[in-house]
Amino acid sequence: TLKRNDIPFDEGNYQMIEYLDSYLISDTKKVKVKDIGKKVALTNSFFFDYLKEYHIPTSFLRIDGEASLKFSITKELPFRIKILNSADKRNSKIFGIKEGTELNLPVFEFHYGCGKESLISESHLIAFDLCTPEDMKLITRICSKINAVLKSFFERRNEILAEICCHFGKYEDKVFLIGDFSPASLKIFPKDESVKWTNPYKLSSAAEVKKYTEHLFNIASVK
């Protein structure tokens, strides 16, 4: 997980998020990675602006400083949606297929909390008043569009979008994408299996985190 500082709302009801040069690779191990905060901030800025071109609502306003982003005020919804286009370790074991196998249709997983048993269903979210049925339909539609846009983006660059994790917030009656495009939430790998690559599911050292972060940054930097 990328470490960050959430700076309190200012008088204009904006929030600043500062990305730090450290990464939590396990519950007990944090590594320092030079310039990772700046590169993740720039990568995030690129993808937020890119999705805006496709009329996807986001709370992102602009980059503000070397490693900080400015967002409009929202109340973060207490769950996240993990979109899978390839079988991850958990699903490959359940369904008896090779890890990394591309799926015919995306799988939407809903997660609540940070524990290992975070996977829940849509009905959990509605039953426990964490989301209304109307907002759930809207969020699912937005996720489908995000996945289609980014999957196509990476395919054109000979990359496979294996997974993306989306976080949402609300302001008044509107829903906004609020994050995130960090190494922890965006998993890609090359179409060409002969290409040497860093497995985003197995980032266990500062060097691996740096290499994968730079890979995402370089893709976002290519115009």
PLM regions and their residue ranges:
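Active-site loop/lid in soluble adenylation, ligation, and acyl-transfer enzymes
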Residues: 1-112, 220
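Phosphate-binding core of ATP-grasp and ATP-grasp-like enzymes
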Residues: 101-116, 147-160, 182-186
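C-terminal helix-cap and adjacent tail motif
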Residues: 181-223
